[in-house]
């Protein structure tokens, strides 16, 4: 069984994957004072039987590293994955300082297009792979190098984000884009080896400024796009695609087993259910409302 969780964090991003193998992956961190203990307790509980834990940080925007110091102080992060960068900020918060400390430490593994690592995407006799692969960045690409320089100069680090996939035999395929911007994605759309996916977590929390170009979506052919928690007036609702909007769904949990992904949301009154989800009797998850299941080929 695999569980993918997208936390409702009030305009930020934070996810985890509880793998079917001996792995636990966190993607980004957005923890506020009011939710810090509940998130910490959930992470500890869900990861307690996993030997390998990693945190993948897409980029050091505040809404992707908020609460990182708290998390690091209270939860073991032995493996910190990020794009190699020298991002700077005029306002050096405690969380940004912690990001830089982890980024520049011996805990860091710098991710790039096609990289491999035990047990991110390699198996051995000890444990299986996580199924995490990095589709971007190409470290020699001119647009990416310009984005690195912008981040080093203290400008927006949005376009240093990696493109991450989760895909493993007999499980669902999902994409994360961090906060990549539309213009940047248009520039690299022919530089990425796109694969079809069941789920896409929309770039930049679903904002129009990060709308994934149609040419990319046509290659990915997502069955469901999850739109994040940007202000509603800034969202692109991806007309023509089935979507779940986190502003109203709140926490989203996807439980994958036996070629079926069961979708649960924490808002019991969520009504806008994707048409391609089918209801299967007997699906339950404590504290959540079941909204339907998606069949996939694995």
What kind of feature is each model-predicted range?
Residues 91-129:
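Conserved glycine-bearing catalytic or ligand-binding loops at nucleotide- and phosphate-handling centers
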Residues 1-50, 113-196, 253-298:
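Core dinuclear metal-dependent hydrolase active-site scaffold
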Residues 28-30, 58-60, 83-85, 113-115, ...:
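Active-site-proximal beta-strand/loop segments in catalytic clefts of secreted hydrolases
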Residues 5-7, 25, 56, 81, ...:
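Hydrophobic/aromatic beta-strand patches that form the interior of the parallel beta-sheet core
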């Amino acid at each position: 069984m695999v569980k993918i969780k997208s936390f409702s964090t009030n305009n930020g991003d934070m996810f985890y994957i509880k793998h079917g193998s001996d792995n636990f992956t966190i993607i980004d961190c957005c923890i506020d004072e009011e939710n810090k203990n509940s998130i910490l307790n959930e992470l500890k509980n869900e990861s307690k039987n996993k030997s390998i834990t990693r945190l993948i940080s897409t980029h050091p925007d505040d809404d992707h590293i908020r609460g990182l110091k708290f998390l690091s102080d209270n939860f073991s992060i032995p493996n910190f994955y990020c794009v190699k960068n020298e991002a700077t900020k005029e306002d050096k918060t405690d969380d940004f300082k912690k990001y830089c400390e982890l980024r520049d430490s011996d805990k860091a593994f710098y991710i790039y297009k096609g990289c491999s690592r035990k047990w991110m995407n390699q198996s051995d006799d000890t444990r299986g792979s996580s199924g995490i692969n990095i589709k971007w960045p190409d470290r020699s690409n001119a647009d990416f190098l310009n984005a690195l320089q912008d981040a080093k100069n203290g400008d927006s680090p949005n376009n240093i984000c990696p493109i991450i996939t989760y895909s493993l035999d007999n499980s669902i395929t999902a994409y994360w884009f961090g906060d990549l911007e539309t213009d940047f994605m248009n520039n690299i759309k022919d530089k990425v080896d796109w694969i079809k996916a069941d789920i896409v977590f929309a770039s930049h929390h679903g904002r129009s400024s990060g709308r994934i170009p149609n040419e990319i979506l046509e290659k990915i052919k997502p069955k469901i796009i999850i739109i994040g928690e940007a202000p509603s007036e800034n969202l692109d609702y991806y007309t023509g695609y089935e979507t779940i909007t986190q502003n109203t769904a709140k926490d989203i949990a996807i439980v994958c087993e036996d070629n079926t992904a069961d979708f649960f949301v924490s808002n019991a009154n969520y009504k806008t259910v994707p048409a391609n989800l089918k209801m299967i009797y007997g699906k339950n998850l404590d504290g959540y409302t079941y909204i339907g299941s998606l069949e996939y080929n694995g």
